[in-house]
Amino acid sequence: MIPYCYHTHTYRCGHAEGEDEEYVLEAIAAGVRKLGFSDHIMLPNFSQPNVRGDYKELEGYLSSINFLKEKYKEKIKIYLGFEAEYDETFESYYRSLLEQHKIEYLLLGQHFSFANGRIIDYFGHVHEKEQLIKYKNLVVKAMSTGLFSVLVHPDLYMSAYDKFDATAKMVAHEICKASLKYNVPLEINLGGIRRGIVKVGEEKRYLYPYKPFWKIVAKYGCRVVIGVDAHSPKNFTTNEYSIALSWIRELGLKHDQDIIINENRTKIDEKL
């Protein structure tokens, strides 16, 4: 049984399937008590087909999830949010969504960075130390803003980097320090487990989660959550959750099953 899921996508991103209500019904059937929708954020004046929905789809997304929140309030607690990459260009937009209570939370998923009109992809394309450092700098800066409730798949940078060298370890340590300093939990992502064991360099492993990274997390005692990263209603009834739980037990990770997903939004409200 999966008690909570705050990492759920919709068909609008172009690479997920199923209607919004199907996710709710399957989550209820799987025993989920708290469900957060967090589709890839729609950005104004920015198009990224098959990665995120166009900005014109924003209101439809908000309306649909708010409708389902009310319809199923006796059966499941539904939260409304987005998964977003950090970039200073979009910080005021993210803040306005939270301040205006259009959404309840943001997940930090640093799949990309944006520079001089170029998109730098961190999923499966990080091979140089400079890219690791850029990734680390972005996620640490993002956590410092107070906008994000969880850093999802924090070990994404290891999806193609084929050695856990001094630079990769330094990135892990700095992410953990920031997680503690800014009170941002780290997510063990089931999406990487669903992809199965693959060969990266000389290792056969998941692209993520990457166990050596999580051994460092355990030493720091950072709060940890599990993210289904649902891209299909069927993802709630597969066995990846039990694998993540076994890692938590094996490594002695601090599993926060009672996370208040929108606690950072409350902090933002208090500053107004």
What is the predicted role of each segment?
Residues 37, 108, 227:
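Short beta-strand and adjacent tight-turn residues that come in two discontinuous sequence segments
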Residues 50-54, 121-127, 202-204:
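Short glycine-enriched, charge-decorated loop/helix-capping segments at active-site entrances
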Residues 1-10, 20-25, 158-159, 163-272:
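Charged catalytic cores and adjacent phosphate/nucleic-acid-binding surfaces used
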Residues 1-88, 92-93, 98-100, 162-170, ...:
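An N-terminally biased module of ancient metal coordination in phosphate/nucleic-acid-related enzymes
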Residues 96-97, 120-122, 270-272:
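Short, surface-exposed amphipathic charged segments that create phosphate/polyanion-binding patches used
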Residues 60-63, 133, 137, 212:
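Short, contiguous clusters of charged residues that form electrostatic/catalytic patches at enzyme active sites
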Residues 1-2, 31-34, 74-80, 101-104, ...:
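Short, well-ordered coil/turn segments that N-cap beta-strands
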Residues 17, 43-44, 107-195, 207:
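Divalent metal-binding pocket/active-site signature
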